[in-house]
């Protein structure tokens, strides 16, 4: 898909289609008014007849509008002008792209980026249009023998900006939007792969492929033998019953002018399949446990995005690859594990395994002397119950870091909601036999999981994103969403001091 920006009048555009907005009730946007004037009232006459009300997502495709050079004009319902917000804007873009794809318009000039969206500038509107377009066109058919093909797919989209001085802003928005989209695409591809293909070694191979393209990215791996020497007994216990070796992939991106600048560390939980182990999960929807590596998929996608943007920042990405299976060699409820930090954990449930992997990684990354650490994981079903599929759960022991992440979520549209991490919850992890248990009971499950992790993140500023509800969709639209790539990438853009809006 090719994107560009221009600034010009709609009637002068030579294109297969131009896209303009119509507000409710039957009120032309400024650009649509220009077309109506040049076509001597052709569009307003259609609206008076009731062909389009202007409700959000309504579409009306016109052919050969008088005095307009474009072959087609697509009128897009935008709802009430004062109510056009971020969510509605992205929904309109998605519906527009789907319609253009169906009409056979291989190229189009889109004027929807000139609509007024509350509190958002041209940069945001163009970038979100790029990301939304790419996301709506995504299709995972790598393993299908018959691939669905659109007869004449949309190949080129031009976004119009109000003035020529905003062209540079629009170009920057496209560049950033394409990088984020590229990262989301990789995240979705990796996460959607079946577990017989996507195992910890596959995660490592995907990281190496990325390093072959980008010279400032270096990839190394830590296998089970090295983990044993280090004392990562908790991580090793989880993967012990699997035929696939546990592999921790370390991705080091050096983009800062000062190579000694402290890195930001991103950790992604990479359970390529989670059966629950001895505490076996129910059979229903167990196939979706291939998505338990959604955190790792998000980290590798983010690393790709920052490589493409060449952000002037140092970042370490960790893919904590592992598989949780039952066998005679599996770890058991009742086992007590000594973690890399030296703290001991009583296992109450082998299906609370993600935290047992992450706790050793949180200790391991101390060697990088990090500026800060963010771990992201499809950690708890409790977070899905609490927040559903719209917001990721955010936990942090550092208020400024939490606020930065919340802000990045609002900017990118990949929102998070901060949850408490109060000391009162820590008592729920008490064990009579070890320093702690790996399960705090049914109440506040997402919080007690974060409390567990916080015990291993005392030596740096730390945040935890629980993406169990946001990393993938179930049902008819089953598949990876590409989250949390947008929020993590936006956070790093902000940290790198890259100029964005007007």
Curated annotation (Swiss-Prot):
Q: Where is the active site?
A: 281, 355
Residues bound to Mn(2+) 1 are 274, 351, 353
Any single Gene Ontology cellular-component annotation = cytoplasm
**Swiss-Prot/TrEMBL cofactor(s):** Mn(2+)
Report the superkingdom from the record: Bacteria
Primary location recorded for the protein, binned into one broad class: cytoplasm
Q: Could you tell me what reaction this enzyme catalyses?
A: Release of an N-terminal amino acid, Xaa-|-Yaa-, in which Xaa is preferably Leu, but may be other amino acids including Pro although not Arg or Lys, and Yaa may be Pro. Amino acid amides and methyl esters are also readily hydrolyzed, but rates on arylamides are exceedingly low; Release of an N-terminal amino acid, preferentially leucine, but not glutamic or aspartic acids
GO biological process terms, semicolon-separated = proteolysis
Cofactor: record remark: Binds 2 manganese ions per subunit.
**GO-annotated molecular function:** aminopeptidase activity; manganese ion binding; metalloaminopeptidase activity
Role description: Presumably involved in the processing and regular turnover of intracellular proteins. Catalyzes the removal of unsubstituted N-terminal amino acids from various peptides.
- Family designation: Belongs to the peptidase M17 family.
Name of the protein in question? Probable cytosol aminopeptidase 2
Please name the gene that encodes this protein: pepA2
């Amino acid at each position: 898909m090719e994107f560009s920006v221009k600034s010009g009048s709609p009637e002068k555009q030579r294109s297969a289609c131009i896209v303009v907005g119509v507000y409710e009730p039957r009120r032309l946007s400024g650009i649509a008014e220009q077309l109506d004037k040049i076509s001597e009232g052709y569009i307003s006459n259609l609206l008076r007849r009731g062909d389009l009300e202007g409700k959000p997502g309504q579409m009306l495709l016109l052919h050969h509008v008088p005095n307009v050079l474009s072959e087609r004009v697509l009128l897009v319902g935008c709802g009430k002008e004062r109510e056009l917000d971020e969510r509605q804007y992205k929904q309109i873009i998605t519906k527009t792209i789907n319609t253009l794809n169906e009409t056979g318009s291989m190229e189009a000039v889109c004027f929807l980026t000139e609509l007024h969206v509350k509190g958002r500038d041209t940069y945001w509107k163009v970038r979100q249009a790029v990301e939304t377009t790419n996301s709506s066109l995504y299709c995972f058919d790598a393993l299908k023998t018959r691939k669905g093909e659109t007869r004449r797919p949309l190949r080129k989209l031009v976004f119009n900006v109000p003035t020529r001085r905003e062209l540079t802003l629009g170009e920057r928005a496209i560049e950033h939007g394409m990088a984020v989209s590229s990262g989301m695409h990789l995240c979705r591809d990796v996460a959607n792969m079946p577990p017989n293909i996507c195992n910890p070694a596959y995660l490592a191979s995907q990281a190496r492929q990325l390093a072959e393209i980008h010279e400032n990215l270096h990839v190394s791996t830590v296998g089970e033998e090295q983990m044993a020497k280090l004392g990562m007994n908790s991580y090793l216990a989880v993967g012990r019953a699997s035929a696939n070796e546990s592999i921790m992939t370390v991705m080091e991106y050096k983009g800062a002018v000062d190579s000694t600048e402290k890195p930001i560390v991103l950790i992604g939980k990479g359970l390529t399949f989670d059966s629950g182990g001895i505490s076996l999960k129910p059979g229903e929807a167990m196939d979706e446990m291939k998505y338990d590596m959604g955190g790792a998929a998000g980290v590798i996608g983010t690393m790709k995005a920052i490589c493409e943007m060449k952000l002037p920042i140092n970042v370490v990405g960790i893919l904590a690859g592992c598989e949780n299976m039952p066998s005679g060699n599996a770890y058991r409820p009742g086992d007590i594990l000594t973690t890399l930090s030296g703290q001991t954990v009583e296992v109450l449930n082998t299906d609370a395994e993600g935290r047992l992997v992450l706790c050793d990684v949180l200790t391991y990354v101390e060697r990088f002397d990090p500026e800060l650490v963010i771990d992201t994981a499809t950690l708890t079903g409790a977070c899905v119950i609490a927040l559903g599929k719209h917001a990721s759960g955010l936990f942090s022991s550092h208020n400024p870091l939490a606020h930065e992440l919340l802000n990045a979520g609002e900017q990118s549209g990949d929102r998070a909601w901060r949850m408490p991490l109060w000391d009162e919850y820590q008592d729920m992890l008490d064990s009579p036999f070890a320093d702690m248990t790996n399960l705090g009971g049914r109440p506040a499950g997402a919080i007690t999981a974060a409390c567990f992790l916080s015990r291993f993140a005392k030596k740096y500023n730390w945040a935890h994103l629980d993406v169990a509800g946001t990393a993938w969709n179930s049902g008819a639209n089953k598949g990876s969403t590409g989250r949390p790539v947008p929020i993590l990438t936006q956070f790093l853009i902000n940290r790198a001091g890259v100029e964005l809006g007007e």
